[in-house]
């Protein structure tokens, strides 16, 4: 979902885009296999920048094997790219690495900026390892930008693919207390962030990939029901029930992360979808 949006945005700006995939079938697609550390040598020749979004989904049940896949897919992908770039005589100028707001500790009252971090637990460990791999490219002379992505709203995947079937039946509800913050962003705005980071040589470091305003889970759920013109009356499943059903993965559904977008405002970034209602209305 995110990759498709970024591809579309880059093409619209006149860029030639190459796609790394395990099974190349179309023109512009090149083979790679991060688990084996292999990549088509032609994939990176002549490119100006790399946007690394690959990683196993965190929205599947966290079995021991899937947790290994979540970590390995991010670290191995970055490592494969790093070795390929290190071997090049003429290197790309920039690497933009996806990251995640999971690096921030759970909080109901704090607003996190890019200077913050320190989350304990599995998600925090994954994000720290992910960003550390991205930072290695600086030693190769590349500009590095890390995009800590929040809850992406888009069609065909993400949180809406999970919520819409229930909400369209009028069976949607908040989760737990509903107090936890959801740092949402429309996928098209996220794609434009990637384009801006790739194009502007003055931008590097950490950036929160979130919209200009967060919403609590209760606000998000009620707004989604309103946009769909459906009732919003179902009682919220308690947090302990979610933990029983989802296991450790329940922390994704219940984590509270209120993130600042001030850094984007400061450089004049213009959001196409600056409020939750307009973002949801565009997608449903």
Predicted regions and their residues:
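Glycine/proline-rich active-site loop of Rossmann-fold NAD(P)-dependent oxidoreductases
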Residues: 128, 140-142, 153-162, 197-207
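Alpha-helical substrate-binding/gating segment
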Residues: 164-172, 180-215
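Mid/C-terminal beta-alpha module of Rossmann-like enzyme folds, strongest
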Residues: 197-248, 281-284
């Amino acid at each position: 979902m995110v990759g498709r949006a970024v591809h579309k945005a880059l093409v619209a700006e006149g860029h030639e885009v190459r796609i790394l995939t395990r099974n190349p079938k179309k023109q512009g697609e090149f083979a790679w296999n991060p688990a084996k550390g292999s990549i088509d040598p032609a994939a990176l020749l002549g490119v100006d920048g790399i946007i690394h979004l690959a990683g196993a989904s965190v929205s599947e049940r966290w079995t021991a094997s899937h947790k290994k896949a979540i970590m390995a897919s991010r670290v191995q992908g970055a490592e494969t790219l790093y070795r390929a770039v290190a071997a090049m005589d003429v290197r790309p100028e920039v690497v933009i690495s996806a990251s995640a707001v999971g690096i921030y500790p759970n909080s109901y009252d704090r607003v996190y900026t890019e200077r913050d971090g320190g989350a304990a637990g599995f998600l925090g460990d994954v994000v720290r390892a992910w960003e550390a791999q991205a930072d290695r490219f600086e030693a190769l002379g590349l500009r590095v930008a890390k995009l800590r992505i929040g809850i992406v709203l888009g069609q065909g995947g993400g949180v809406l693919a999970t919520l819409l079937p229930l909400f369209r039946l009028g069976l949607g509800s908040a989760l737990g207390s509903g107090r936890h913050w959801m740092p949402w962003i429309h996928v098209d705005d996220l794609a434009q962030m990637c384009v801006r980071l790739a194009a502007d040589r003055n931008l590097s470091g950490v950036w929160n990939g979130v919209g200009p305003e967060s919403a609590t889970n209760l606000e998000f759920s009620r707004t989604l029901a309103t946009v769909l013109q459906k009732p919003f009356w179902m009682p919220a499943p308690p947090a302990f029930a979610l933990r029983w059903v989802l296991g450790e993965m329940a922390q994704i559904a219940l984590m509270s992360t209120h993130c600042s977008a001030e850094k984007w405002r400061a450089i004049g970034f213009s959001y196409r979808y600056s409020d939750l209602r307009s973002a949801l209305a565009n997608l449903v």
